[in-house]
From Swiss-Prot:
It is an enzyme of class 3 (hydrolase). It comes from Homo sapiens (Human). The gene is DHX9. A motif (Nuclear localization signal (NLS2)) lies at residues 1155-1173. The modification N6-methyllysine is found at residue 146. It is linked to Intellectual developmental disorder, autosomal dominant 75: An autosomal dominant neurodevelopmental disorder characterized by developmental delay, mild to severe impaired intellectual development, and neuropsychiatric manifestations including autism spectrum disorder, anxiety, and obsessive compulsive disorder. Disease features are highly variable and may include hypotonia, seizures, non-specific dysmorphism, poor overall growth with small head circumference, abnormal brain imaging, and heart disease. This is ATP-dependent RNA helicase A.
């Protein structure tokens, strides 16, 4: 095989070109591989090899490139020596026509229902078909982005990136703000004679009502439209935000000028200057280290009315990389005999390394034929599959896919398209002796869908997952064989894999495209480009109830195949029907006084519960008018469940509810009712955050006489099919996350679902017999529902997607997003670019820096990613990864009321920190589970903690650490440490300092009781779920008035969630952008005033600049963390000192009655010999907290190992448990110091002595669950 490299070199030499090879090590020390990429000038393709040694990697990369040259007819296949280069099958372009017969929806159904309730079925069949070869209309939806970026390129202005000193938003967008934008927009409307009207949508229940305003305007001089959709707590704010987005877009398109007047800022509440008690000795040390770092400090201003800026510019910058002029495309290549597409690596050993495609195809065909003849169970399953509606369309589907690069399959719920279409393709290739040419990846919107569908398909093929069918979701993979296989995965997993290209995959099937999440929209842009560059690839788009015309147009008028479902009709009813059938009378309204932040706001959106037809009785109209439209009526759901009993039609009931809180409350509500809590009912929750074992229960049949009631979010709306569901009760709501960029505000709103969502939910009934769907919204409300939900790309920050665009080398961020099916607003794109430049993730040429490359690989918010890197530098990487991972999931506290009880508050110790509470919970749980699964369950029940959340946090943390280690960070800086939250702990001080960096600009100042001030003195409240929230009207005094927080939540009031107390020195160091001094007072970010010496403040801002410079050096070469030069070590020690509360004169032990009248929390055990959770040399697993961590305990029978159960993984397992056999003890063999002589911190085994990486394999696509330690 080595000759292939010479062949390519000779071929290039004849054309006066030279192949360029780039090789790098990937993976960690124990399983290192080498990735080689080869490029040839003039060809937009990168050949790739991934092997265990450099020579094979180079040969495989050359071979891949030669195969590409054969495919594009640059080389004839017979000219190539026998390297196993296969010619692609010929591609025909015959246009295909597809069936578009009308779908019959039955209008009547039997059943014991009152005849006056029979409703007309809607006729919603409207999709036709068109030939693929017909060119579509010009696609110019992203023209605004294209215009802006083309003008920017023409000017070729080298941005000096000085906007760091400017307000994040206004300065970036021509100084247009909430206050001045609406007036300018009105002027523009008058001049252009535009009738601009805001379209308002109300979201949330009465006590948490807010509004969305949206508007589309046509710009004559550009010949295009721009669109904005923004959120506000009332109509006025929503309209102002919408106007602001429109004006900023007009500014960037050159239609309106920058604002030149004085920006009037609303005067927020002023903060009194805070006196910082800094010792003379510490100030002297600060000045010394600044001198050592050769930094110059500005003297105080001569005139106090002209303050000086203390911020020091960047001390180190990444060298700009070469600007990417070519618009990149993710590379694709067809399946090849020695390439495993699921691990993105070459097969260099074993029989498959040298097998020809013909041999592979013949072996797999013989195996399938033998199985079909001998396996009687399989024959029975095949007969079942024959009955699925999609089976009738098999030949039509296969023909369309073979003739067209892109095909859309629109199939009614339950027709079998998700499980059958991939198998049709696979079996067709195997039976036609082309097995080696087929590998199919199928994306699902959620992990439960990917796993359950993969398990179902494996069952239908008479196999276990891991043979011809597998899955890969975050934290868990069972990979199929390298050839003739189907891989089900989440969209996020596929996007992570794209860095290695879509190599070795013949078909990409994207299921549920109507969901319009940001990842699916991003994937569709990637695939559209791939199809244009590589027409041989096959893309299949599938969904149930979408208007496919937009997707059809986007993919060049591709054909649409309509598949009709089972003929069981589903009768649907609305709120008025449900009330009349059940004779429901609402209970008396609860008169309890609302909290102050739940009040206010006028509701001028019509209450549709007051609109009821004359055909309903007066009792029905009265009951309906008494129901609050914004609340989910639990009592009506109970009444419907009792009504369903009277129908005597057996079947499961699926109840759609918006969010985990309602599911949990409804479950408890039903279980406490003697009727529904009895053995006659099985109440099951279904939510993405519950363990897989719990999720699987919803598929299990129940005994005769038992009714299964499934309480689910919209997770059950798509892909997963629960066969025995006959009844659907639909709240008609769902929970969405809305983010407003200009004020950094997050809002979790319960909103009305769209008509598309309701149609999907209705379709879940009637799989086994005629079904019933009860919508808990009135007919009048249904008529007002949106047809589709707003795409996620319009309501979420874009910086994570922007990083992916750069990592995949897809060109400019704006230019790429302009190609989206519905491009995001221009101002959102510019903000994403600015955020990444500010973090040093992009260089002067807008290409990824080494830091940006690491951040792009971390599946977490980029600012948190940089915080984790800084954590590694301070050797507190594990704690920072734990906190970052915990932010991905709900809090682990199980809490009945809104405020936390003492059992949960005690985890914060005396740190006044929600983040420290999370860290302590995780630490205590991690210790408890050393005693096995039963000990873990007991601990979680006793402390009222959600075990599933803690397990998922652990998995996420391990994955984040794995990525950092694979990026070259030393394992030592990511070791687990013990923290104390009740006494001095400098490591914990540093963690809090870095947290202040990670959550910036979320800083607040405590005034009184729950009242706090956020940026620019705006009023807000401490969130009720915080450990810092006082009980009732209790007034609290904290050791420091300053806090950082995770996010601002907009309810009726604005509240800060996830709060941690910080010192003013920590703010100056890591949570500030603009620092000014007049010689007496230091002003931070224009609102926080500190009484601190000018010199001390200047030295601290200098330390920040030095720290940023060190991050630049470390990300170029992470291994240098273990051998920093003395000056940097002293600088880090200085930051450690400044991070201590005592450095700012703050005593955390002040105020022993921290949480009101309750008992003082018990002190946590000191971690000395033999006491506390981690008992020195005699730890739970027989010693070896650090040593056993990787001496084989975890992998051999660990989580996902041979025992394949939580008990085996989290408890003792087969091979000695998670922390393994006695190998040294956490503090040495007999409680010695951390790095003591008798084994020490890491024991004699070290961090990673396992024989393999178990479940994590090679990144997302892992090597299955197999052996070895972690």
């Amino acid at each position: 095989m080595g000759d292939v490299k010479n062949f390519l070199y000779a071929w290039c030499g004849k054309r006066k070109m030279t192949p360029s090879y780039e090789i790098r090590a990937v993976g960690n020390k124990n399983r290192q591989k080498f990735m080689c990429e080869v490029q040839v000038e003039g060809y937009n393709y990168t050949g790739m090899g991934n092997s265990t040694n450099k020579k094979d990697a180079q040969s495989n990369a050359a071979r891949d490139f030669v195969n590409y040259l054969v495919r594009i007819n640059e080389i004839k296949s017979e000219e190539v020596p026998a390297f196993g280069v296969a010619s692609p099958p010929p591609l025909t372009d015959t246009p295909d026509t597809t069936a578009n017969a009308e779908g019959d929806l039955p209008t009547t159904m039997g059943g014991p229902l009152p005849p006056h309730l029979a409703l007309k079925a809607e006729n919603n069949s409207e999709v036709g078909a068109s030939g693929y070869g017909v060119p579509g209309p010009t696609w110019d939806r992203g023209a605004n982005l294209k215009d802006y970026y083309s003008r920017k390129e023409e000017q070729e202005v080298q941005a000096t990136l000085e906007s760091e000193e400017v307000d994040l938003n206004a300065g970036l967008h021509g100084n247009w703000t909430l206050e001045n934008a609406k007036a300018r927009l009105n002027q523009y409307f008058q001049k252009e004679k535009i009738q601009g009207e805001y379209k308002y949508t109300q979201v949330g229940p009465d006590h948490n009502r807010s509004f969305i305003a949206e508007m589309t305007i046509y710009i004559k001089q550009l010949g295009r439209r721009i669109f904005a959709r923004e959120h506000g707590s009332n109509k006025k704010l929503a309209a102002q935000s919408c106007a602001l987005s429109l004006v900023r877009q007009l500014y960037h398109l050159g239609v309106v000028e920058a604002y030149s007047g004085l920006t009037k800022k609303k005067e927020g509440e002023t903060v009194e200057p805070y006196k910082v008690n800094l010792s003379q000795d510490l100030e002297h040390q600060l000045q010394n280290i600044i001198q050592e770092l050769n930094l110059e400090i500005l003297p105080p201003p001569e005139d106090p009315s002209v303050p000086v800026a203390l911020n020091i510019g960047k001390l180190a910058q990444f060298e700009p990389s070469q600007r990417q002029n070519q618009v990149g495309v993710v590379p694709w290549s067809p399946p090849q005999s020695n390439w495993n597409p699921w691990t993105s690596s070459n097969i260099d050993e074993g029989p498959l390394a040298f097998a020809t495609p013909e041999q592979i195809s013949m072996d797999l065909k013989n195996e399938l034929m033998y199985q079909l003849e001998q396996d009687h169970d399989l024959q029975a399953i095949l007969q079942e599959r024959e009955l699925l509606p999609v089976k009738k369309f098999e030949s039509e589907i296969l023909e369309a896919i073979s003739q067209n690069s892109v095909v859309i399959i629109r199939g009614a719920t339950g027709c079998g398209k998700t499980t059958q279409v991939p198998q049709f393709i696979l079996d067709d290739f195997i039976q036609n002796d082309r097995a080696a040419e087929c590998n199919i990846v199928v994306t699902q919107p959620r992990r439960i869908s990917a796993v359950s569908v993969a398990e179902r398909v494996a069952f239908e093929r008479g196999e276990e997952p891991g043979k011809s069918c597998g899955y890969s979701v975050r934290f868990e993979s069972i990979l199929p064989r390298p050839h003739a296989s189907i891989m089900f995965c989440t969209v996020g997993v596929l996007l992570r894999k794209l860095e290695a290209g879509i190599r070795g995959i013949s078909h990409v099937i994207v299921d549920e495209i109507h969901e319009r999440d940001i990842n699916t929209d991003f994937l569709l842009v990637v695939l559209r480009d791939v199809v244009q560059a590589y027409p041989e690839v096959r893309i299949v788009l599938m969904s149930a109830t979408i208007d496919t015309s937009m997707f059809c147009e986007y993919f060049f008028n591709c054909p649409i195949i309509e598949v009709y479902g089972r003929t069981y009709p589903v009768q649907e009813y609305f709120l008025e029907d449900c009330i009349q059938m059940t004779h429901f009378v609402p209970p008396p309204k609860d008169k309890k006084k609302k909290d102050k932040d739940d009040d206010g706001g006028e509701d001028d959106d019509a209450n549709c519960n007051l609109i009821c037809g004359d055909e309903y009785g007066p009792e029905t109209r009265l009951s309906m008018s008494q129901l609050n439209e914004k609340e989910t009526p639990f009592e009506l759901i109970e009444a419907l469940l009792k009504y369903i009993e009277t129908l005597n039609v057996p079947g499961a009931v699926l109840v759609f509810l918006p969010g985990w809180n309602l599911i949990y409350t409804m479950q408890k509500h039903l279980e406490m009712n003697p009727h529904f809590g009895s053995h006659r009912y099985q109440i099951l929750p279904l939510h993405s955050q519950i363990p897989r074992e719990e999720q699987r229960k919803v598929f299990d049949p129940v005994p005769v006489g038992v009714t299964k009631v499934i309480l689910s979010t919209n997770i059950a709306e798509t892909s997963i099919t629960i066969n025995d569901v006959v009844y659907v009760i639909d709240s008609c709501k769902q929970k969405v996350k809305l983010f407003t960029a200009h004020n950094n505000m997050t809002n979790y709103a319960t909103v009305w679902a769209s008509k598309t969502n309701l149609e999907q939910r209705k379709g879940r009934a009637g799989r086994v017999r005629p079904g019933f769907c009860f919508h808990l919204c009135s007919r009048a409300r249904f008529e007002r529902l949106e047809t589709h939900m707003t795409p996620e790309m319009f309501r979420t920050p874009l910086h994570e997607i922007a990083l992916s665009i750069k990592l995949l080398r897809l060109g400019g961020i704006g230019q790429f997003l302009a190609k989206a099916i519905e491009p995001p607003p221009l101002d959102a794109v510019i903000e994403a670019e600015h955020t990444l430049r500010e973090l040093d993730a992009l260089d002067a040429n807008d290409e990824l820096t080494p830091l940006g490359r690491i951040l792009a690989k971390l599946p977490i918010e980029p600012r948190f990613g940089k915080m984790m890197i800084m954590g590694c530098i301070f050797y507190v990487g594990d704690a920072i990864c734990t906190i970052a991972a915990a932010t991905c999931f709900p809090e682990p506290f199980i809490n009945e009321g809104k405020r936390l009880g003492y059992i949960h508050r005690n985890f914060a110790g005396n740190r006044f920190s929600d983040h420290v509470a999370l860290l302590s919970v995780f630490q205590a749980w991690d210790d408890a589970r050393m005693g096995g699964e039963e000990a873990e369950i007991r601990f979680c029940e006793h402390k009222r903690l959600n075990m599933a959340t803690l397990r998922m946090t652990w998995e996420a943390k391990v994955q984040l650490k794995e990525i950092l280690i694979n990026s070259g960070f030393p394992e030592d800086c990511l070791l687990t440490q013990v923290f104390t939250n009740t006494g001095p702990d400098n490591n914990l001080d540093v963690v809090i300092s870095l947290l202040a960096f990670g959550v910036y600009p979320n800083v607040c100042y405590h005034k009184e009781k729950r009242k706090i001030l956020t940026t620019e003195g705006r009023n807000a409240l401490i969130h009720k779920s915080s450990v810092n929230c006082p009980f009732s009207s209790q007034d609290m005094k904290y050791p420091s008035p300053f806090f950082v927080f995770g996010e601002k939540i907009r309810t009726r009031a604005i509240s800060a969630k996830g709060m941690t107390l910080v010192t003013p020195l920590q703010l100056l160091l890591f949570a500030s952008k603009k620092v000014q001094s007049d010689g007496q007072i230091v002003l931070v970010d224009d609102w926080i005033k500190l009484q601190i010496s000018h010199e001390a403040a200047a030295c601290i801002t200098g330390l920040r600049a030095a720290m940023e410079a060190l991050v630049v050096e470390v990300t170029k070469q992470p291994a240098i963390i273990s051998q920093l030069d003395p000056v940097n070590e002293r600088m880090l020690n200085m930051i450690r000192q400044i991070s201590r509360p005592s450095a700012a004169g703050i005593n955390l032990m002040i105020g022993s009655t921290r949480y009101g009248d309750g008992p003082r929390p018990p002190k946590m055990a000191r971690y000395d010999n033999g006491s506390g959770y981690r008992r020195g040399g005699s730890s739970y697993s027989g010693g070896g907290y650090g040593g056993g961590y990787s001496s084989g305990g975890y992998g051999s029978g660990g989580y996902g190992g041979s025992a394949n159960s939580f008990r085996a993984g989290y408890g003792a397992g087969v091979g000695g448990g998670y922390r393994g056999v006695s190998r040294g003890g956490f503090r040495g063999n007999s409680g010695g110091d951390y790095r003591g002589p008798s084994g020490g911190y890491r024991g004699s085994g070290g961090f990673q002595r396992g024989g393999g990486r178990g479940a994590y394999g090679t990144g997302y696509f892992g090597q299955g669950r197999g052996g070895g330690g972690y």
